[in-house]
Amino acid sequence: MEKYYKKEGRYSYYEAGEGTPIVVLHGLMGGLSNFDAVARYFSEKGYKIVIPDLPIYTQNILKTNVKAFAKYVKDFITFKGFDRVILLGNSLGGHIALYHTKMYPEKVAGLVLTGSSGLYESAMGDSYPKRGDYEYIKKKAQAVFYDPAMATKELVDEVYASVNDRMKLIKTLTIAKSAIRHNMAKDLPKMHVQTCLIWGKNDSVTPPNVAEEFNELLPNATLYWIDKCGHAAMMEHPDEFNRLLEDWLTHTHLKAH
């Protein structure tokens, strides 16, 4: 993915393909929301896939919250010169996508949420009481997936390093508090954007009842399930995820021309 990686001004981002822009928002731990397969597939199908690095650990602590990240995404979309985009978010990225849609509905042609936070906030994890215990962190990372083998050593190392970095831990807890403050339950019924929900039936972070609640509260939502799948559907079942997303894009007339 390196050759598609760009740094311009205050933004670092991955970009591939030409066409309808899909802006992808990752979760707290980038490695746990790996969109490689989605990026490869849709960049060859008439979409421009753009994945900005969100400043989760690099912004001032006062700007370490869902609302400030949503504003960052809006500024990035303006910087790129996009008129309207399809927003795709996983976990915290889904919450940021939702808040962005609430604040700037005119910028969002469609919304795709997978394992999104915004309604159910144990999604943010705890204060990692045993964060120095590598095996404990490994089990936490494995629990994100249906198949624990998805939590590679490289990925577990990334999570372990993050939770043992004091500043990152403080910011993670700050974001968790912000996510609870910015619960979306009251806002969702007013959000009429076409929304695609793709959920793992075995998601233990944002369980299936969360997807059902999103589906009930969002007026124009369509819910798709993936079996034997945890919190990161686009990583665990990329082909199925891509097929469902492509179907939805076709049915909602958001398909690239």
Go through the PLM ranges and name each one.
Residues 12-59:
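Conserved HGGG/HGGXW glycine-rich cap/lid loop of the alpha/beta-hydrolase fold
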Residues 25, 54, 114, 226-229:
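Alpha/beta-hydrolase
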Residues 36, 44, 50-88, 243:
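Active-site loop/oxyanion-hole signature of alpha/beta-hydrolase fold enzymes
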Residues 131-193:
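Conserved alpha/beta-hydrolase catalytic His-Asp/Glu region
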Residues 98-103, 107-139:
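Flexible "cap/lid" loop of the alpha/beta hydrolase fold
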Residues 89, 93, 97:
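Gly/Ala-rich beta-loop-alpha elbow adjacent to hydrolase catalytic centers
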